[in-house]
C-alpha cells in the first residue's frame, strides 16, 4: 500500500459526513463544540494509539512530507550546538532532503549512511560510524517500501544516545505504520510521522509526533498560544474523523 491503493470506505464516509457541516470548530456553540470534539479526540487517539505517545505534541499538515520538513527545521534551527546531522541513502526524499536542506541552511555537515547492498537495510554498526558528539540530529526511516526492511529504531536510537545523549532522533514511519506497531516511547525518538492515505485513510493530511523537548522549541505559532501548540488556523475535523474511523477498524 505504499502508494495508498487501499482505502477504508468508512474513513471516506466519516470525512464526507463531517464536511457537510458548514460550521467552525472554534465557535462556542453546540455544533462548534461537536466539531471541536473530533479534533480533540482525534488528536488524542493519533498520539496515543498510532504513535504510542504518553506526551508530546501533534503536527498536522497537508502531507507527511511537510511535517518532516517542519519538525527537522525546527530542531536544526532551534539548536545552537553541533556541527553535523546524519541520515541515510535509503530515506524517502522528504526525510533525506529535509536534513540536507537544513544542514545547508544552518552551516552544518550533511552525512549520509549508505544502505547495505546485500540486505537492502541499514546496519546499526554502519550508522554509528557517522554519529559523534557533534551530531545534532539522526534521521532513520522505520521501514523501507523499496527493500522491505524494517529498521531496529530502538537499538539505533539507544546506541546513538550512548555516543551523544543530547542527539535528536527522527524516524519516518510512513511505510511502517500500516504494517507494524509504532511506539515512540519505546523507541525513544523525538520525531515520527505517518501518512493516513497509506494507512487506509484519506489524502490531504499528514501527522507527526514531536517529543516534549521539541514541542516547546520556537516554532511557527500564534503568539497567545501555549509554547507546545503546533496547530495553526482552523483545524479540519473531517480529517480527524476519518483517521478515527481507521483506528476503529484496525484496533
Regions found by a protein language model. Name each.
Residues 1-251:
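Pyridoxal 5′-phosphate
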Amino acid at each position: 500500500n505504499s502508494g495508498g491503493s487501499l482505502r477504508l470506505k468508512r474513513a471516506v464516509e466519516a470525512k464526507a459526513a463531517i464536511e457537510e457541516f458548514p460550521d467552525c470548530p472554534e465557535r462556542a456553540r453546540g455544533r462548534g463544540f461537536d466539531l471541536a470534539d473530533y479534533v480533540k479526540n482525534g488528536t488524542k487517539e493519533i498520539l496515543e494509539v498510532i504513535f504510542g505517545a504518553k506526551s508530546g505534541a501533534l503536527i498536522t499538515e497537508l502531507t507527511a512530507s511537510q511535517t518532516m520538513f517542519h519538525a527537522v527545521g525546527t530542531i536544526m534551527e532551534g539548536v545552537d550546538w553541533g556541527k553535523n546531522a546524519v541520515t541515510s541513502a535509503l530515506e524517502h526524499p522528504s526525510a533525506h532532503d529535509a536534513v540536507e536542506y537544513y544542514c545547508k541552511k544552518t552551516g552544518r555537515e550533511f552525512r549520509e549512511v549508505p544502505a547495505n547492498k546485500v540486505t537492502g537495510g541499514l546496519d546499526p554498526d554502519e550508522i554509528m560510524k557517522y554519529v559523534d558528539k557533534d551530531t545534532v540530529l539522526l534521521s532513520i526511516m522505520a521501514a523501507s517500501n523499496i527493500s522491505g526492511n524494517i529498521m531496529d529504531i530502538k537499538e539505533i536510537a539507544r546506541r546513538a544516545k550512548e555516543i551523544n545523549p543530547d542527539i535528536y532522533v527522527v524516524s519516518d514511519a510512513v511505510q511502517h505504520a500500516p504494517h507494524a506497531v509504532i511506539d515512540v516511547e519505546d523507541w525513544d525518538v523525538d520525531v515520527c510521522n505517518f501518512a493516513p492515505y497509506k494507512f487506509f485513510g484519506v489524502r490531504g493530511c499528514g501527522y507527526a509526533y514531536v517529543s516534549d523537548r521539541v514541542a516547546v522549541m520556537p516554532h511557527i505559532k500564534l503568539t497567545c498560544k501555549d509554547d507546545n501548540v503546533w496547530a495553526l488556523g482552523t483545524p479540519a475535523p473531517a480529517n480527524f474523523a476519518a483517521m478515527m474511523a481507521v483506528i476503529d477498524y484496525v484496533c
